[in-house]
Amino acid sequence: MGKTAIDVWEQIKLLESRGMVIKDKEKAQEVLLDAGYYRLGFYWFPFETTYPNKINRTHQFREGTNFDYIVKLYYFDFNLRSILMKYLNRIEIHFRTFLIYKVSNYYRTSPTWFADSTVVTAAYVRKFDQEVYTNRFKSISIIQQHHKTHINDKYAPAWKTLEYMTLGGIIHLFKALKDKMICRAISEHFKVRQLPVFESYLKTILTIRNYCAHGNVLYDIALPTSIRRGPAGQMESANYHLSLIHISEPTRLR
């Protein structure tokens, strides 16, 4: 398209001039205005003659490339994100809940253990105080109400504060825990014996979750790090993992 904006009908003509078959131009207009020419470009790229070369692209399409193929791939990606997001949210909530439960019960006399340098690294405490709690969490109404009620508390307890932490923040906190026995206990709760493997899973889950949340193209995602295939400790079957986080679909009544 170059650096000059063109309207949707010009976009359709441009695609046709490059060899794309567009049978229903009204529908193509609707899709282009809904998803956008640039975004759809990620989905028609595999149909270009120079694919997968991103340098010196000709933008010409392979013979027989139909706009309908691109639309189907786009909606496949859309639906894939929706499905993954549903289950990734459940994983995120369960991981956060169990971490708060496990560590809070281990350090019962320290309800704000996330800011205790005997529990987590000093570097984490400094960053949390400056960048997280003061700048973001104190604007949350429930946290504000806690400080109005408990005026001498520097922080709200973990079960309040950490509920508002992102998955990335929770993973960062998990890795900052000094007692790796607690980390291993959490890892084994998810039936993964090896802590490094569990952390690699968390990193992958975070990457995919962020892709889904931000509407990024998912069908050809290239993960920055690989994850181990096969047993990761395999203390139970795959069905156990589903039942553990309660994400299996409810059984239909017969």
Language model regions located:
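Histidine-centered, metal-coordinating catalytic motifs and their short helical/loop contexts
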Residues: 200-224
